[in-house]
């Protein structure tokens, strides 16, 4: 699969002067709820109305969606509110039903993207379709799986493709529900610059208070659109209540986002420069996050050394680390001088932290 300009044609056809906005409830709950939200979104920047009908939940016993009956409600949304409709599909049966009700946009969820078997089943069921098909990143940070999903769909003669970045699961404590790991969608964008890239800040955040910040970062990284879970009564939503916002809040949030526009070669240069600088900011934050984790491990080592009455400085171990890192640095185009300075500073901070533990 090669990046082609026509991959963006479905997005260009919207002729928008703002990022694409996909919004609607995490789950369709009742017909009244679905239509009420749709009416509230009708005269906003929202182009596509989303609602989950089949909900793949982590554990059984939780609300798993209303199922096929919700397709009738989405049909009413299209006819009465004039919005395009979107829902998640996880197997060939879902695809068949969604196509029967003329759903405009189908997305493959994170739990499905991890399985080539599921993606292939969906691709076979969608073969030759002219519907817009979006692929969410897999649950785990694996770019090959994400690209593999796109390639299977492309091989089934599906040309209207896009990707949704919803973050990645992690065992580590984080302010995010799913860590953004921005470097992965950036890498995908670098390889396939013509595939529309949409951010799902709702699933990255898992809470309302950081939705705008995540959305702004996505736009600064040149994402083409946002998918935001929206509900008229989010606190009482049947699923993912904490991350949903009202249509009014969505409108205010969109008004508060800074959206860059290109009007000249100079603007194009500034846009590209801003995107690259944002990428550096994301990477720098990742470096600090990693260094913080490293220092926590160093403190744990200090506690163990204190318990066993072992000296802080272990010269043999330090020389091994330095030698290995210099070799690794050379492979990545980093000079020996730079690697030495950096790891000496890191090592000194580790020693300082361990000495604090031992002397406490």
Spans of model-derived segments:
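N-terminal amphipathic alpha-helix/helix-capping segment at the start of soluble metabolic enzymes
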Residues: 1-22, 76, 255, 265
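N-terminal small/glycine-rich loop or linker at the start of catalytic domains
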Residues: 8-26, 57-60, 189-199
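Catalytic alpha/beta core domains of metabolic enzymes, predominantly
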Residues: 14, 118-249, 256, 262-268
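Active-site mouth loops of central-metabolism enzymes
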Residues: 19-36, 60-65, 84-88, 109-110, ...
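Hydrophobic faces of well-ordered beta-strands that scaffold small-molecule active sites
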Residues: 20-25, 47-51, 85-87, 106-108, ...
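Glycine-rich, proline-tolerant flexible connector loops at the mouths of alpha/beta enzymes
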Residues: 50-69, 232-241, 301-310
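Catalytic beta/alpha-barrel core
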Residues: 66, 82-91, 95, 104-118, ...
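Extended, charge-rich alpha-helical interface modules
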Residues: 259-360
């Amino acid at each position: 699969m090669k990046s082609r300009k026509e991959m963006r044609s479905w997005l260009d056809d919207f002729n928008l002067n703002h990022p694409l906005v996909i919004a609607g409830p995490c789950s369709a709950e009742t017909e009244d709820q679905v239509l009420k939200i749709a009416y509230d979104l009708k005269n906003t920047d929202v182009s596509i109305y989303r609602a989950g009908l089949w909900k793949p939940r982590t554990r059984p016993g939780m609300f798993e969606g209303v199922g096929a009956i919700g397709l009738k409600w989405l049909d009413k949304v299209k006819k009465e509110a004039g919005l395009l409709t979107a829902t998640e599909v996880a197997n060939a049966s879902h695809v068949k039903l969604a196509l029967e009700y003329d759903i405009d946009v189908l997305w493959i969820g994170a739990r499905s993207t991890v399985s080539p078997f599921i993606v292939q089943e969906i691709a076979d069921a969608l073969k030759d379709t002219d519907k817009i098909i979006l692929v969410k990143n897999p649950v785990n940070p694996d770019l090959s799986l994400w690209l593999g999903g796109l390639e299977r769909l492309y091989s089934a003669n599906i040309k209207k493709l896009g990707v949704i970045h919803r973050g990645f699961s992690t065992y580590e404590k984080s302010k995010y529900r799913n860590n953004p790991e921005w470097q992965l969608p950036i890498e995908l964008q670098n390889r396939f610059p013509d595939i529309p890239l949409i951010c799902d800040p709702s699933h990255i955040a898992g809470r309302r208070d950081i939705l705008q910040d995540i959305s702004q970062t996505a736009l600064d990284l040149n994402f083409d659109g946002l998918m935001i879970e929206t509900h008229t009564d989010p606190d009482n939503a049947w699923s993912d209540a904490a991350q949903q916002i009202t249509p009014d809040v969505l409108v205010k949030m969109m008004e508060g986002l800074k959206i860059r526009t290109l009007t000249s070669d100079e603007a194009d240069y500034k846009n590209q420069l801003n995107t690259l600088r944002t990428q550096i900011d994301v990477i720098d934050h990742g470096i600090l996050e990693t260094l913080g984790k490293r220092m926590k491990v160093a403190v744990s080592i200090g506690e163990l050394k204190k318990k066993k009455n072992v000296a802080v400085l272990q010269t043999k171990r330090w020389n091994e680390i330095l030698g290995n890192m210099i070799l690794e640095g050379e492979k990545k185009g980093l000079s020996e001088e730079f690697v030495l300075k950096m790891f000496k500073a890191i090592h000194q901070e580790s020693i300082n932290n361990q000495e604090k533990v031992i002397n406490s």
